[in-house]
From Swiss-Prot:
GO terms for cellular component: periplasmic space. Plays a role in intracellular Ca(2+) homeostasis. Involved in cell protection against oxidative stress in strain 25W. It comes from Pseudomonas aeruginosa (strain ATCC 15692 / DSM 22644 / CIP 104116 / JCM 14847 / LMG 12228 / 1C / PRS 101 / PAO1). This is Calcium-regulated OB-fold protein CarO. Strain 25W was isolated in the ocean, whereas the reference strain PAO1 came from wounds in infected humans. Disruption phenotype: Does not affect growth at high Ca(2+) level. Does not affect the basal intracellular concentration of Ca(2+), but impairs recovery to the resting intracellular Ca(2+). Increases sensitivity to tobramycin at high Ca(2+). In strain 25W, increases sensitivity to tributyltin (TBT), cadmium, mercury, acidic pH and hydrogen peroxide. Keywords: Periplasm, Signal. It is found in: Periplasm. It holds the Pfam family BOF. Residues 1-21 form the signal peptide. GO terms for biological process: calcium ion homeostasis; response to antibiotic; response to cadmium ion; response to calcium ion; response to mercury ion.
Amino acid sequence: MKLRHLPLIAAIGLFSTVTLAAGYTGPGATPTTTTVKAALEAADDTPVVLQGTIVKRIKGDIYEFRDATGSMKVEIDDEDFPPMEINDKTRVKLTGEVDRDLVGREIDVEFVEVIK
């Protein structure tokens, strides 16, 4: 195979991945959890989209997140934060999934968005 076809193959792979990442939302799809209360009761790997505030940093990349229904731990890697400062008054939308282990549940955050 010639190298001139490599960009075309890479583009096809990229666009097909973006389409798959959107996910299925029709009948039989796993519903997205939208509150801390529901996330605390959800199964492992349940998708979540939560809106509220990051109250404090507990340690490392573990933070306490709060919405109108309660609070829980969330894990946010530095590269997942937006390029602006966030404090305990900033409303954010967290997208991720429930991470359940022997100690309890936390949210493994994949994306942080500031709500204006």
